[in-house]
């Protein structure tokens, strides 16, 4: 299926699918809903259909996507946890919805589910998503995303856990592509990427982070901090005090400056900060519902208090 066909066809088809799902899928028996595997497959593919560009634009414009419950919980291994439908709508759909804006991976244009198993109201899947990295000469890059998703009785996502597989390899590939395009070394490409991301973040700051939301004294101070005071970041540091973390949050500033401006500022807000050790990251108690199916979940250390 071509991208051009998708642009014409998907919005209407996806909207119809979203309206249809809650009417026909499994209902709650008083506890967790018990969907068939076919129904869970439909819920899974509906999410990924909406994740692709330009369908994700429609989801982003909804502010609170109907694909999520109001109190949805989400965790992404390379970043952090995200609470609530509005925040998840911004990060899941808004982050990858503008092909003309500087970004690491651009916009998602296709996907293939390569692994899938489901029971009750939970599905575990591996999805290879093709991104058009528009900031890297429209380089098409496959990105492998492992997900656990849990739905409520109305077919809405109530919690998810996502892992970007081989993300370090992906970052190296993007830097190598940039090095080739500028006919330079990987060190020169890394410096060029750092400057590009910092310039973009500071331009966004100057436009949206004004008045009480201002984080830097001026553009020069912003560039100095982002290029000299913090590292670019490793593949697992998109939720730490790095430039890559601020690149992620820069996309969200336009939607809610009061919330997101601190994330691109010197303090990092409560997202781009070094507040967790490795063990704290791994052992973080977070989810309201256990991912364990069919047997007692006693001893599940990820369950929130």
UniProtKB/Swiss-Prot annotation:
The keyword Glycoprotein applies. This is Aurasperone B biosynthesis cluster protein A. Belongs to the bfoA family. Residues 1-26 form the signal peptide. It comes from Aspergillus niger (strain ATCC MYA-4892 / CBS 513.88 / FGSC A1513). The lineage of its organism: Eukaryota, Fungi, Dikarya, Ascomycota, Pezizomycotina. Keywords: Glycoprotein, Signal. The keyword Nucleotide-binding does not apply. Part of the gene cluster that mediates the biosynthesis of aurasperone B, a dimeric gamma-naphthopyrone. The first step in the biosynthesis of aurasperone B is the production of gamma-naphthopyrone precursor YWA1 by the non-reducing polyketide synthase albA, via condensation of one acetyl-CoA starter unit with 6 malonyl-CoA units. Transmembrane segments: none annotated. Glycans are attached at residues 29, 34, 64, 83, 132, 183, 218, 288.
């Amino acid at each position: 299926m071509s991208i051009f066909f998708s642009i014409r066809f998907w919005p209407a088809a996806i909207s119809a699918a979203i309206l249809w799902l809650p009417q026909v899928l499994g209902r709650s028996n008083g506890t967790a809903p018990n969907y068939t595997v076919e129904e869970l497959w439909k819920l899974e593919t509906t999410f990924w259909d909406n994740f692709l560009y330009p369908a994700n634009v429609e989801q982003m414009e909804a502010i609170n996507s109907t694909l999520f419950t109001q109190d949805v919980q989400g965790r992404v291994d390379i970043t952090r946890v995200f609470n609530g439908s509005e925040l998840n709508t911004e990060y899941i759909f808004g982050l990858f919805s503008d092909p003309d804006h500087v970004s690491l991976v651009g916009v998602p244009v296709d996907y293939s589910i390569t692994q899938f198993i489901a029971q009750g109201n939970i599905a575990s899947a591996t999805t290879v998503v093709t991104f058009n990295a528009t900031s890297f000469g429209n380089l098409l890059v496959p990105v492998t995303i492992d997900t656990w998703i849990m739905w409520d009785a109305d077919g809405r996502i109530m919690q998810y856990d996502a892992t970007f597989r081989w993300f370090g390899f992906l970052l190296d590939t993007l830097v190598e592509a940039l090095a080739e395009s500028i006919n330079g070394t990987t060190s020169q490409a890394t410096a060029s990427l750092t400057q590009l991301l910092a310039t973009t973040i500071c331009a966004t700051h100057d436009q949206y982070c004004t008045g009480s939301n201002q984080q830097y004294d001026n553009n020069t101070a912003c560039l100095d901090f982002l290029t000299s005071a913090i590292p670019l970041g490793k593949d697992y540091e998109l939720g730490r005090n790095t430039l890559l973390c601020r690149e992620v949050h820069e996309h969200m500033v336009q939607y809610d400056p009061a919330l997101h401006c601190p994330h691109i500022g010197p303090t990092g807000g409560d997202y781009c900060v070094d507040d967790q050790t490795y063990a704290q990251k791994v052992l973080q108690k977070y989810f309201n519902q256990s991912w364990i199916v069919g047997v007692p979940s006693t001893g599940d250390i990820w369950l929130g208090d």
